Amino acid sequence: MDLRKFIRDIPDFPFEGIIFRDVTPLLKNPQAFQAAIDKMAETVSDIDFDLIVAPEARGFIFGSALAYKLHKGFIPVRKPGKLPYETTSIEYDLEYGTAKLQIHSDAIDKGEKILLVDDVLATGGTANAIAQLVKKLGGEVAGTCFLVELTYLNPRERLRDYLIRTVISY
């Protein structure tokens, strides 16, 4: 199945000159969504890991579905004020400012191997910040997995220390 047919291009969103790769048509189609999760699972089949960590919002969708398929635990990474227990935070730079992410401080045990999952790998900023959170808690980033990679933004440069697996590249 050609999953690209289920990814809609939205020009000038969220800013002029940006082409947003919208995965919601893929999520709407049960066969495409299942194929996407199956392909993501195939791409990480050789990676030894204990848990999947993924950011809100679309990362939750792909990360939790992949965790279910692979019989792994799932750890959410959220924006500040969304997690009910003690958290560990990281602030990181965006093209247009800064952002902050949080994870429960007890979410990862020392030495646990983590697979970081998200829908789109754009600049690599969010993924790099999450990797830093994982390390802060004593975890090891075993690899990363994304449905879509925007190669023209050179995200691998920022994530050069990590194994990167993607299903679709633009």
Curated annotation (Swiss-Prot):
Function: Catalyzes a salvage reaction resulting in the formation of AMP, that is energically less costly than de novo synthesis.
EC number(s) given by UniProt: 2.4.2.7
Keyword Transferase annotated: yes
Localisation: Cytoplasm
Organism classification: Bacteria, Thermotogati, Thermotogota, Thermotogae, Thermotogales
Protein name according to UniProt: Adenine phosphoribosyltransferase
Gene3D superfamilies (UniProt xref): 3.40.50.2020
InterPro entries for the chain: Ade_phspho_trans (IPR005764), PRibTrfase_dom (IPR000836), PRTase-like (IPR029057), UPRTase/APRTase (IPR050054)
Pathway annotation from the record: Purine metabolism; AMP biosynthesis via salvage pathway; AMP from adenine: step 1/1
GO CC annotations on file: cytoplasm
Main location (coarse class): cytoplasm
HAMAP family: Aden_phosphoribosyltr
Lineage top rank: taxon: Bacteria
Pfam families: Pribosyltran
The species this protein was found in: Pseudothermotoga lettingae (strain ATCC BAA-301 / DSM 14385 / NBRC 107922 / TMO) (Thermotoga lettingae)
Keyword Glycosyltransferase carried by entry: yes
A GO BP entry: adenine salvage
Molecular-function GO terms, alphabetical: adenine binding; adenine phosphoribosyltransferase activity; AMP binding
Keyword entries, A-Z: Cytoplasm, Glycosyltransferase, Purine salvage, Transferase
Assembly and interaction partners: Homodimer.
Alphabetical list of PANTHER family matching this protein: ADENINE PHOSPHORIBOSYLTRANSFERASE
CDD domains attached to this UniProt entry: PRTases_typeI (cd06223)
Substrates-to-products reaction catalysed: AMP + diphosphate = 5-phospho-alpha-D-ribose 1-diphosphate + adenine
Family indicated by similarity: Belongs to the purine/pyrimidine phosphoribosyltransferase family.
